[in-house]
Design a protein with these regions (language model features):
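Sec-dependent N-terminal signal peptides of Gram-positive bacterial secreted proteins and lipoproteins
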Residues: 2-26
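Post-signal peptide N-terminal segment of secreted/secretory-pathway proteins
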Residues: 24, 85-116
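N-terminal, intrinsically disordered, polar/charged segments of Gram-positive cell-envelope systems
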Residues: 26-62
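Acidic/histidine-rich, surface-exposed loop or edge segments in extracytoplasmic proteins
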Residues: 60-61, 72-91, 124, 194-203
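Soluble non-cytosolic domains of exported or imported proteins
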Residues: 68-72, 89-100, 210-211, 291-295, ...
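Solvent-exposed, polar/charged alpha-helical surfaces in well-ordered, non-transmembrane soluble domains
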Residues: 76-80, 93, 97-100, 104, ...
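Extended substrate/cofactor- or partner-recognition/assembly subdomains adjacent to catalytic sites
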Residues: 104, 108-282
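C-terminal soluble interaction/assembly domains
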Residues: 255-328
Length: 328
């Protein structure tokens, strides 16, 4: 039986048990999950994924920690991702929102991309995909994944880009600005205010990062712009959220997102840079937030969950107009 026939057979067995794509078995009845109302609107499962006996697609995952590839169903993979991307004691609805995003991310990845690790559908390499920390899975993470089993975001019959970051600094941003995304800014991702939790670490809410001039010059070159010996550093063009699109080094425009990656994204925590100063050999940046600023803010999700919002409400804030569907 070829792949398409296997997929069709598995779906034929699984979907009737769920009702017409809409029966949320074991779901919280107080949550009004927004579902696609027709088969035509459901995203298709990636063709290269096999369907397991439990009706859940199976992944080949390359683990960079032990350099081995193993097969697991998507639900098990999602548990490890949720535990890697959020602390396992976070509010339940924030964990659920992260689970739905993690599931959407891996399905879109398997649909559109190929892992750089031969024989794998995806890896635990954060440069390629998502953080994966199975040792941090606890009862809360399992509950969040179980209660959102098979659920993913859907946009016009496809998987949307399920971007997320740690802390928006107060406002999210367009992918074209914060990520240099060339695919066009999706309708479901617009700059929007994001109320961040006061429990976020102080060095995430506001931070300072100091580099040598040589480090700045090398990062500029690695980002594609040679600037020579650094004399001046200024902020250039900005997006709606205030994030830098360019940084002017010796008057030359350098891509701010690329510069951040090259100089160290864990030190220059975002491109929401409020000031830059040159003092002797030191170049000091001050800014807010952590991460690229596109899509869901994890500390914003934390705050919404603390306020009593559901996972659905959290996702609809950060991805307005996007639906949630149950695929298995």
């Amino acid at each position: 039986m070829n792949m398409k026939k296997k997929l069709a057979a598995a779906l034929a067995l699984a979907l009737p048990a769920l009702g017409l794509f809409g029966c949320m078995q074991n779901r919280d009845p107080s949550v009004n999950w927004r579902l696609s109302d027709s088969k035509a609107n459901l995203p298709k499962l990636p063709q290269r994924l096999e369907i397991g006996k439990n009706g859940v697609p199976t992944l080949s995952v390359y683990d960079v920690s032990d350099k081995k590839t193993s097969d697991m169903d998507i639900e098990r993979y999602v548990m490890g991702v949720v535990a890697g991307e959020m602390k396992n004691d976070w509010p339940m609805e924030a964990l659920k929102a992260q689970a739905i995003l993690a599931r959407t991310f891996v399905l879109k990845f398997c649909q559109d991309k190929q892992s750089k690790y031969e024989g794998a559908d995806i890896s635990t390499d954060v440069a390629e995909a998502q953080a994966y920390v199975p040792n941090s899975v606890n009862a809360r993470v399992r509950q969040a994944v179980d209660e959102t089993r098979g659920m993913a975001l859907s946009w016009q019959g496809d998987y949307p880009n399920a971007w997320f970051h740690a802390h928006s600094g107060g406002m999210t941003e367009l992918p074209s600005v914060a990520l240099e995304y060339k695919g066009g800014d999706p309708q479901y991702l617009k700059p929007a205010p994001s109320g961040e939790s006061k429990r976020a670490p102080e060095d995430v809410k506001a931070w300072t990062a100091t580099f040598t001039k040589a480090q700045v010059a090398k990062a500029c070159a690695d980002a594609g712009t040679r600037v020579g010996a650094v004399e001046t550093v200024e902020l250039g063009e900005k997006g709606e959220s205030g994030r830098a699109i360019t940084i002017l080094v010796n008057g030359k425009a350098v891509s701010a997102p690329s510069f951040r990656i090259q100089i160290g994204a864990n030190r220059l925590k975002s491109t929401l840079i409020e000031s830059v100063a040159v003092d002797g050999d030191a170049v000091t940046f001050k800014g807010r937030g952590f991460g690229h600023g596109v899509g869901l803010s994890q500390w914003g999700a934390y705050q919404m969950a603390e306020e009593g919002r559901t996972a659905q409400q959290i996702l609809q804030k950060y991805f307005p107009g996007v639906g949630i569907v149950e695929l298995w």
